[in-house]
Amino acid sequence: MLSRLFKAGEKVLSNLVSKKDIYMASRNQEKSPKVQELYDLCKETFTGKAPSPASMAIQKLCSVLDSVSPADVGLEEVSQDDDRGYGVSGVSRFNRVGRWAQPITFLDIHECDTFTMCIFCFPTSSVIPLHDHPEMAVFSKILYGSLHVKAYDWVEPPCIITQDKGVPGSLPARLAKLVSDKVITPQSEIPALYPKTGGNLHCFTALTPCAVLDILSPPYKESVGRSCSYYMDYPFSTFALENGMKKVDEGKEDEYAWLVQIDTPDDLHMRPGSYTGPTIRV
């Protein structure tokens, strides 16, 4: 009798252990939110210095970033018939047309000493002017919409014009090479820029309502020299090369521009918003 009770008890205990194992296994198999996976990868990858573009970790990060959808970060795609507010449109400073567009909304997902995760929500025609990312790497995912990107890298060694009477008040001007001048969508390859390659200086113009998920490493930090500077671009023909400067190949002048640092543009209108996606476990 006792032996049968012991055997029955062992069977019940075995069933309980089996069910617990199944439950724990199912819990372990549950996928973390995509934004959590992205955060965990950023935490593993970034050490405080701009990463190498050839690293396997960066390739993995870009792969995960590319899979993020608006719903993964608490967004819904905005109708193309969005309201208009203050702003300008056009991809060139010489042919932009005055137009009303709402302010750009900035959503802060996470920021620490080594990286920033954030979202920019653009109404149609809104613009983030040409700006830089000193000693930083930036990875961007277009979540929805169409965005025009124009990007430059500095010509090395530096080619700087310090005197020119033709354009008063616009100097010094530094030569940069055009890296990108195109429209990107959610189907586009992840734009990745680095301190000296990939288009470290870029400007955005929203052709439709759109949202961009950005990862920056390391973050902007003025106290250590990583402050955001804005620029105006001028055609290569605006200034004459000074003696001793490296010549630009004939017929390729359109691939270069002179960049002049300016104050933060008055028409840059940005407002903070609330991130409503999954909470990140830090």
From Swiss-Prot:
It is found in: Nucleus; Cytoplasm. GO terms for biological process: cellular response to hypoxia; detection of hypoxia; peptidyl-cysteine oxidation. Fe cation binds at H131, H133, H202. Its cofactor is Fe(2+). Optimum pH is 8.5 with CGGAIISDFIPPPR peptide as substrate. Its EC number is 1.13.11.20. The keyword ATP-binding does not apply. It holds the Pfam family PCO_ADO. One of its GO terms (molecular function) is iron ion binding. GO terms for cellular component: cytoplasm; nucleus. Binds 1 Fe(2+) cation per subunit. It catalyses: L-cysteine + O2 = 3-sulfino-L-alanine + H(+). The keyword Metal-binding applies. Keywords: Cytoplasm, Iron, Metal-binding, Nucleus, Oxidoreductase. Catalyzes the oxidation of N-terminal cysteine residues (N-Cys), thus preparing the protein for N-end rule pathway-mediated proteasomal degradation, upstream of the N-end rule enzymes ATE1, ATE2 and PRT6. Controls the preparation of the group VII ethylene response factor (ERF-VII) proteins for degradation via the 26S proteasome N-end rule pathway. Acts as an oxygen sensor that controls the stability of ERF-VII proteins, which are stabilized in flooding-induced hypoxia, and regulate transcriptional adaptation to these adverse conditions. Belongs to the cysteine dioxygenase family. PANTHER family: 2-AMINOETHANETHIOL DIOXYGENASE, PLANT CYSTEINE OXIDASE 3. This is Plant cysteine oxidase 3. It comes from Arabidopsis thaliana.
